Swiss-Prot record:
Protein family (similarity comment): Belongs to the ABC transporter superfamily. ABCF family. Translational throttle EttA subfamily.
Protein name: Energy-dependent translational throttle protein EttA
An example Gene Ontology biological process: translation
Pfam family, one: ABC_tran_Xtn
Location of the ABC transporter domain: 6-256, 322-552
GO MF annotation, one: tRNA binding
Length: 558
């Protein structure tokens, strides 16, 4: 194997006037595990496409080591539309599957027609299959399909959703075992156990990995290096995500006051990383006792500075925020919520977790009055002012620009109880300069999510309901949103799959714990996500607490 699996020398890449890479020189070690981070639009996906040979730099050299293989998971991966799920996954095994089929064919022929030629061919095939560790190929295939929750093997891929197609493509790619594995948001559309399996599989993967992801626990558990892309430059940091936070904070301190806000946010996130589980729980409980203090402090400081996301202070909350009492709610004859009771604390941040389709959004719609309970009650306090925008982003004119959607064409807008420059407000959500002039109809998933956030937080409520706000956000925006919530004097309820976000911000967890006996069962817990997971094991035992999916096994024999 060459010293480097991939090399870039003085690479420049631009899309029109936007420079993605500016005179970048990098070399990647064989077997290195690298997480790629940076703001949306920094060119993370473009770098993967160049390394996969799907795109070329404008200047400079970029090349794979001689004889090495490369594979990529794209955000919208191509599949063979004429084949089933299994047919596509088997393509990842390449000629190994052909050789295994031929070995079995030769074995059958030799039962009736033993010849030296067949014996020689069988010996050669056996040696190649031994080297490729291919004897349990079917078991490897079924294990990977199960671990990644692929659709049924005989399902035509033309029937699959976007998330299902990504799982099939990831499964196919992992089975192909390239020397350089390029992954663009690999944890998107995976459930918690599939993510855990993938982390363990990649941590022991013999080849090099470059993964673009906003999943910070994934970056902590898998990455040995972090490559940050920012304004055309590439900054490599040795270590995982926690180490990256520390080293970047040091770099910003050297750069001086220009990035003071960013440095402050990184320092606060780093302090959380360094604190133990008990300290995190203590801080979470302290927040619940500090509502009056935080509200008074926020009222004194009316000025909003939108270099980062900020949540405007809403009216003072009374003692009753939302009280849910023995709530039952179903849809199309299926029970989604059964006998659910909880009371929102007025300075609480509640994480709502569970797979897609179990009723999380239905719960939100019931709280805001868009759905009515089948039985039980939902009482919203008299002092509550809700901030909520439907996940479907209804009412956004696709022809309007991002700035027009948020500002209605006004230079100054009302954000909560304060008037602010509209372009500065929109800029805080990652829409800088010309990005504010993009028509809403052409936005990516992450951009639509940031626009939805801007519309929700602009309302100035004291109870904020956020439906999947962390989807498709870069780590910078995620950190900014976390800090904004932690500094917000009010109550927030957030549907999210982001484990880091749930751990860092939440005072409570509302978790779907449905099973065969009761698919509409929910559990209310005081504490963050990590504490909830420990509690679940204590209550239900290790086996019962784990989702009923395969535990990690390597895709090799031995």
């Amino acid at each position: 194997m060459a010293e480097f699996i991939y090399t870039m020398k003085k690479v420049r890449k631009a899309h029109g006037d936007k420079v993605i890479l500016d005179d970048v020189t990098l070399s990647f070690y064989p077997g290195a595990k690298i997480g790629v981070v940076g703001p949306n639009g920094a060119g993370k996906s473009s770098v993967l496409r160049i390394m996969a040979g799907l795109d070329k730099p404008n200047n400079g050299d970029a090349f794979l080591a001689t004889g090495a293989t490369v594979g990529i998971l794209q955000q919208e991966p191509p599949l063979n539309e004429d084949k089933t799920v299994r047919g596509n996954v088997e393509e990842g095994m390449g000629d190994i599957k052909i050789k295994l089929d031929r070995f079995n064919e030769v074995a059958e022929l030799m039962a009736t027609d033993y010849t030296d030629e067949l014996m020689e061919e069988m010996g050669r095939l056996q040696e190649e299959l031994d080297h490729a560790d291919a004897w349990d190929l079917d078991a490897q295939l079924e294990q990977a399909m199960d671990a990644l929750r692929c659709p049924p093997a005989d399902e035509p891929v033309t029937n699959l959703s976007g998330g299902e197609r990504r799982r099939v493509a990831l499964c196919k790619l992992l089975l192909s075992k390239p020397d350089l594995l390029l992954l663009d948001e690999p944890t998107n559309h995976l459930d918690a156990e599939s993510v855990q399996w993938l982390e363990q599989h990649l941590a022991s993967y013999p080849g090099a990995i470059l993964a673009v992801t906003h999943d910070r626990y994934f970056l902590d558990n898998v990455a040995e290096w972090i490559l940050e892309l920012d304004r055309g430059r590439a900054y490599p940091y040795e270590g995982n995500y926690s180490t990256y936070l520390e080293k970047k904070a040091e770099r910003l301190a050297v750069q001086g006051r220009k990035d003071a806000k960013l440095q402050k946010r990184l320092t606060e996130e780093l302090a959380w990383v360094r604190s133990g589980a008990k300290a995190r729980q203590a801080k979470s409980k302290a927040r619940l006792q500090r509502y009056e203090e935080m509200a008074a402090e926020a009222e004194k400081t009316r000025k909003l500075d939108f270099e980062e996301i900020q949540i405007p202070v809403g009216p003072r909350l009374g003692n009753v925020v939302v009280e849910v009492d023995h709530l039952d709610k179903g849809y199309d004859g299926r029970a989604l919520i059964k006998d659910l009771s909880f009371s929102l604390p007025r300075n609480g941040i509640v994480g709502v977790i569970g797979p897609n389709g179990v009723g999380k959004t239905t719960l939100f719609k019931t709280i805001v009055g868009l759905e009515t309970p089948d039985s039980g009650s939902v009482k919203v306090g008299e002092t509550v002012k809700l901030s909520y925008v439907d996940q479907a982003r209804a009412g956004i004119d696709p022809r309007k620009t991002v700035w027009e959607v948020v500002s209605d064409g006004l230079d100054y807008i009302q954000v909560g109880q304060t008037e602010v420059p509209s372009r500065a407000y929109v800029s805080a959500f990652g829409f800088k300069g010309p990005d504010q002039q993009k028509p809403a109809g052409v936005l990516s998933g992450g951009e639509r999510n940031r626009l939805n956030l801007a519309l929700t937080l602009k309302q100035g409520g004291n109870l904020i309901l956020l439906d999947e706000p962390t989807n498709d956000l870069d780590v910078e925006t995620l950190g900014s949103l976390e800090n904004a919530l932690l500094n917000f004097p009010g109550c927030a309820v957030v549907i999210s799959h982001d484990r880091w976000f749930l751990d860092r911000t939440c005072t409570h967890i509302l978790a779907w714990e449905g099973d065969d006996d009761n698919e509409a069962k929910w559990f209310w817990f005081e504490g963050n996500f990590g504490a909830y997971e420990e509690n679940k094991v204590e209550r239900l035992g290790v086996d019962a607490a784990r989702p009923h999916r395969v535990t990690h096994r390597k895709l090799t024999r031995g």
